[in-house]
Curated annotation (Swiss-Prot):
Disulfide bonds, paired cysteine numbers: none
Organism for this UniProt entry: Saccharomyces cerevisiae (strain ATCC 204508 / S288c) (Baker's yeast)
Low complexity composition-biased segments: 509-518
Post-translational modification note: Hyperphosphorylated in the absence of SIT4.
Protein family: Belongs to the SAPS family.
Miscellaneous section: Present with 279 molecules/cell in log phase SD medium.
Entry coiled-coil feature ranges: none
Protein name: SIT4-associating protein SAP4
BP term (GO), one: G1/S transition of mitotic cell cycle
Length: 818
C-alpha cells in the first residue's frame, strides 16, 4: 500500500482539467461570436486542443456541469485558500454558463441561488445534522456514488467558498445586494432556532466573514435593511445572533468610528430591549436575553479600557442611563417584580460598575468645555441615574417592609398597591422550618449596595461636578441639534420627497475617511467654542461655579449644625445617604441578617454595605452620620426632620445598636445553637468580619472627634473584652493554614535555605562566607523556634475554647442584664 498522496495530486489535476476544458469552450464561443483573433496568445496550448478536440462549440456546451464538477473536487478549498489559484477564482467570480433557455447565468449567482435553495429546503424539511460546518465535504468523498442528495454537502461547500481567504470572492459577495438580502431572509425561517439546525451556523459563518473582511461595505448594507433591530430582537433567545450583533457594535471604535452605534440608537435598540422586560408578555428566557444584550453593550462601553473588546462610552449607554429609561427600569422593579425585576436590577448594577467616574480619562473638575468639547463619546455621568433611584428610596423601603409583612402574615391583604409574593415554609437539613428570604429582597438590597458604591464616587459628592455635567449635557444636545440641522440642509429634496441620500446616509461616513473626519469635527467644534459661536449659549466658565459648595466639616463631625448644613443643599451622593439614614435601611438589613442565619449570599451583601460605611471618609459627605446611626439609631433620629415622621407615624425601627443588638446578640444566638448542634450558625464568618471592621474603624479614627457617643460605645467593657480577647483569638486561629504546620512562606524559605546549604557543602567556603552563613543559620533557627512556639500555642486554642470565652464575656453578661 502506497502512502504517496495520489488523491491530492489527482484532485489538483482534476481542477486544472475542468478549467482547461471550460476556458477552451469559453474562448471558442467568444471567437465565434466576435470573429476576432487578437487574443491568440491567451488561447490554450495545442496539447490541450488535441485533448479536448477542436470541433466547433455552441452555447449548450458551456453548461452548469463545469461548476457542478468543480464543487465536488476535494482540493477546491485548498486551491482557494492556500494555493491562491487565480484561474479558479476568476472562474468562480467572473465565469458563467448558459442554461437550457440559452440565458447567461453567472457562477456566483448560481452558487447563491443553490445555497439559498438548500437552506430553504433544510428549513422546510426540518433537516438536522450532528456535524459542525467545519466538517468539510472531504469526509464524504463517496457522496457522488450515492443516490440521495445530501443538502448539507453543497451547503458546506458553497459556504466555505464564500468564507474563503480569496478577496475577490468576498468582495463580489458583499456587492451582491440581492444575495445578502435573501440571506437575511433566514430570520423568517421557522427552524432557525431549532437545535442542531445548520441554517444559523451558515448565516453567521458568511456574515462574520463579510463583516471582518469588508467592514465598510457590509455595514452599509446592514444599515439599509428595514427593521433590522426588530429582526434580531425577535430571535433574541438565540445567543449566537446576539453575539453577532455585539460584534457589529465593536466595529464602532473611538479611533475609527463606523457610526453603527448612532444607527442602532435611531433604531430604538434600548427602548425595545427594555420593553421586553414584561412578565405578562415575555418568558424569563427572553427577559434574560434582553438583559444580557444590554449588559454586554455596557461591558464594551466602559469609560476605561479593560481589553480589546472596547468601544468606549456612546449614545446607547448614555441613553440607558438617562432619567427617562432609569424611570422605566425603576417601574419594572416596583411594579413588574418577579423575573423582570431581577433583570432590571442587574442592568442598573452593571451600569454603575462599568461607569465609575473615578476612572474617567478626563476629569470634569479639572477641565473646561473649550479644552474638551462635549461629545457622545464623553464618559457617562451617573448623577441622573443615582438621583432618580434616590427619589424612589421610600418605594424600595416600602417594598422591603411589604415583603416582610407577607412573611409575618400569610393572610395579609391590606396592601393592594403591589403584587403579593408568598413564601411557603421550607425545611433545612437540620429539620428546621424556615421561610425563605426571597429573591426580591435580595435584589433590592443588592441594588442599595451598588447605589452606595455609586454615592461614594467623587463626582457624586461635588456640587460643582453636578453643574459642570448639566452644562455639558445642554451643550451636547445643542451640538447634536446643529448636526441634525446641517444634515437636513444637505438632503436632496425633489417634489417634497427625500431621495436615497437620507439623514442616515449623511450621518454615516465612509469607513476610510471616518478617522480623519472625526478629528476634523473635533477641531471644528473646538474652534466654534473659541470663536464664541457656541460659547455664548452657555456659561462655560468656572467663575459661576462656587468651590465653597463642596463643604468642609467642623469638629465634631456629627452635630446638628453640620446636619442642617448638608441637608440644606446636599450633593446627589449625600441625598442618597440621607435617605438611607432617615428610612432606617441599615437596622433593617442587620435584623434580617440575624433572622436568616443560613443565607450566606445575603450575609455577603450586608457585609459589603457595612464595610463601605466604615471605610468611607468621615470628614466628607454624610458618611459619619451613617456610622453614628449604626451605633445608636434612636439618638440619630434627632437629625431626621420632624415632618418625615409625625406624632402619628411610627419609626421604622425603634432602636438599634450594632454592638449590642448585632455583634453580641449574633454571638449569643450562635452560642445557644452550638450548645444544641455543636456547630456555629452560618452567619458567623461575616459577623466576625463586620466586628473586624468596627475594630479597625476604632483604631484608624479618633472617634471622639467624630461623635463622643461613638467613642463611649467603643469604650464599653463588654466590647473592649470581646475585641481584645475573643476577636483577636478568632483572627489568630483562622490564620492557621488548613491541615496545620508552618506558614507557607516560612516553609518555602526554609526549603530554599536547606537547598543552598546542601549545595555549598561540596565547595570550600571562604572564612568570611562561613561566618555570614553561621549568622544567617542562627537567625533562621531563632525564627523557626518562634514559629514553632506560636504554633504550639495556637494548637492549644480550639473552637471550643473560643466558645467558652463567648459564654464568659457575652452570654453571662446578657444574663446579668436580664
Amino acid at each position: 500500500m502506497s502512502l504517496w498522496p495520489f488523491g491530492e495530486t489527482l484532485s489538483h489535476s482534476g481542477i486544472d482539467s475542468i478549467l482547461e476544458e471550460y476556458y477552451l469552450i469559453f474562448r471558442s464561443l467568444e471567437g465565434n461570436e466576435t470573429s476576432s483573433t487578437d487574443d491568440k496568445k491567451n488561447e490554450p496550448s495545442m496539447e490541450s486542443e488535441s485533448e479536448f478536440g477542436t470541433e466547433s462549440r455552441d452555447r449548450s456546451d458551456l453548461n452548469q456541469s463545469f461548476i457542478d464538477r468543480i464543487l465536488l473536487e476535494t482540493a477546491l478549498l485548498d486551491e482557494l485558500n492556500g494555493a491562491a489559484n487565480d484561474r479558479l477564482v476568476d472562474f468562480i467570480c467572473l465565469g458563467y454558463f448558459y442554461d437550457d433557455r440559452s440565458q447567461q447565468v453567472r457562477h456566483m449567482d448560481y452558487l447563491v441561488d443553490m445555497l439559498m435553495a438548500y437552506l430553504k429546503d433544510i428549513d422546510r424539511t426540518g433537516y438536522r445534522t450532528p456535524f459542525l460546518l467545519e466538517n468539510s465535504f472531504h469526509q464524504t468523498g463517496e457522496y457522488e456514488d450515492q443516490d440521495d442528495e445530501d443538502p448539507m454537502l453543497y451547503v458546506n461547500i458553497i459556504s466555505s467558498i464564500f468564507c474563503s481567504k480569496s478577496a475577490p470572492i468576498v468582495e463580489a459577495l458583499v456587492q451582491n445586494t440581492p444575495f445578502l438580502s435573501s440571506l437575511f431572509e433566514v430570520f423568517q425561517f421557522e427552524n432557525i432556532e431549532a437545535e442542531n439546525c445548520p441554517i444559523l451556523a451558515v448565516f453567521l459563518k458568511i456574515n462574520e466573514t463579510l463583516l471582518f473582511e469588508q467592514t465598510s461595505s457590509y455595514l452599509e448594507f446592514f444599515k439599509s435593511q428595514p427593521n433590522i433591530v426588530d429582526k434580531f430582537l425577535y430571535h433574541i433567545e438565540v445567543s449566537p445572533l446576539v453575539e453577532f450583533l455585539i460584534k457589529i457594535m465593536l466595529t464602532d471604535q473611538v479611533e475609527s468610528p463606523t457610526n453603527i452605534i448612532d444607527f442602532l440608537y435611531h433604531q430604538d435598540l434600548i427602548p425595545k430591549c427594555l420593553n421586553l422586560l414584561e412578565n405578562s408578555k415575555y418568558s424569563p428566557g427572553i427577559q434574560n436575553s434582553s438583559g444580557e444584550l444590554l449588559k454586554a453593550l455596557i461591558s464594551i462601553s466602559t469609560n476605561f479600557k479593560l481589553d480589546t473588546l472596547w468601544i468606549g462610552p456612546n449614545r446607547l449607554t448614555r441613553q440607558l442611563a438617562s432619567p427617562q429609561y432609569v424611570d422605566q427600569l425603576i417601574n419594572i422593579i416596583l411594579f413588574q417584580r418577579g423575573h423582570a425585576m431581577g433583570v432590571a436590577v442587574s442592568i442598573i448594577i452593571e451600569l454603575i460598575r462599568k461607569n465609575n467616574s473615578d476612572y474617567d480619562e478626563v476629569d470634569l473638575l479639572s477641565t473646561t468645555i473649550v479644552d474638551n468639547p462635549p461629545s457622545q463619546r464623553d464618559p457617562v455621568y451617573l448623577g441622573h441615574l443615582l438621583y432618580e433611584l434616590t427619589m424612589h428610596m421610600e418605594d424600595f423601603y416600602a417594598l422591603l417592609i411589604k415583603l416582610e409583612n407577607d412573611d409575618d402574615d400569610d393572610h395579609d391583604t391590606a396592601s393592594k398597591a403591589l403584587p403579593s409574593v408568598k413564601h411557603h415554609l421550607l425545611e433545612n437539613q437540620l429539620h428546621e422550618s424556615f421561610r425563605p428570604l426571597g429573591f426580591e429582597r435580595v435584589k433590592i438590597t443588592e441594588l442599595i449596595s451598588e447605589m452606595l458604591h455609586c454615592s461614594n464616587m467623587g463626582l457624586m459628592n461635588s456640587k460643582r461636578g453636578e453643574k459642570i455635567a448639566r452644562t455639558r449635557d445642554k451643550c451636547r444636545d445643542t451640538l447634536d441639534q446643529n448636526s441634525l440641522e446641517k444634515a437636513m440642509k444637505n438632503l436632496n429634496i425633489n417634489d417634497n420627497t427625500i431621495t436615497s441620500n437620507t439623514l442616515e446616509d449623511k450621518c454615516n461616513n465612509n469607513d476610510s475617511n471616518d478617522s480623519n473626519d472625526n478629528q476634523k469635527q473635533k477641531k471644528n467644534i473646538k474652534k466654534k467654542f473659541h470663536d464664541n459661536e457656541l460659547y455664548s449659549t452657555f456659561d462655560t466658565s468656572d467663575d459661576n461655579i462656587d468651590d465653597d459648595d463642596d463643604m468642609s466639616f467642623e469638629i465634631p463631625y456629627v452635630s446638628e449644625t453640620q446636619n442642617l448644613k448638608i441637608r440644606k443643599n446636599p450633593t446627589i451622593g449625600d441625598l442618597f445617604k440621607i435617605k438611607l439614614h432617615d428610612l432606617g435601611f441599615f437596622p433593617k438589613f442587620l435584623q434580617l441578617f440575624l433572622r436568616y442565619p443560613w443565607n450566606n449570599f445575603w450575609h455577603n451583601i450586608v457585609f459589603d454595605i457595612i464595610q463601605q460605611i466604615f471605610n468611607g471618609r468621615m470628614d466628607f459627605s454624610y458618611n459619619s452620620f451613617l456610622v453614628y446611626s449604626l451605633f445608636d439609631f434612636k439618638k440619630s433620629t434627632r437629625f431626621i426632620p420632624k415632618p418625615l415622621y409625625g406624632s402619628n407615624q411610627k419609626l421604622p425601627v425603634k432602636d438599634f445598636h450594632i454592638i449590642s443588638d448585632f455583634i453580641l446578640q449574633g454571638h449569643k444566638d450562635s452560642f445557644e445553637f452550638y450548645e444544641k448542634e455543636k456547630t456555629n450558625l452560618g452567619y458567623m464568618g461575616q459577623l466576625v468580619l463586620i466586628a473586624e471592621e468596627i475594630a479597625k474603624y476604632s483604631k484608624i479614627y479618633k472617634t471622639d472627634l467624630i461623635a463622643p457617643d461613638i467613642y463611649a460605645f467603643l469604650q464599653d467593657e463588654v466590647w473592649m473584652s470581646y475585641s481584645s480577647d475573643i476577636l483577636n483569638e478568632t483572627r489568630t486561629m483562622c490564620s492557621i493554614i488548613l491541615g496545620g504546620g508552618q506558614f507557607c512562606a516560612e516553609s518555602d524559605e526554609n526549603t530554599n535555605q536547606d537547598f543552598l546549604e546542601k549545595a555549598d557543602m561540596s565547595k570550600p567556603a571562604h572564612p568570611s562566607t562561613m561566618d555570614e552563613n553561621e549568622i544567617v543559620h542562627e537567625e533562621d533557627v531563632k525564627l523557626h523556634d518562634k514559629v514553632a512556639e506560636l504554633i504550639d500555642e495556637l494548637g492549644q486554642l480550639t473552637e471550643l475554647d473560643i466558645h467558652d470565652k463567648i459564654k464568659d464575656v457575652i452570654v453571662d453578661h446578657h444574663s446579668d442584664l436580664n
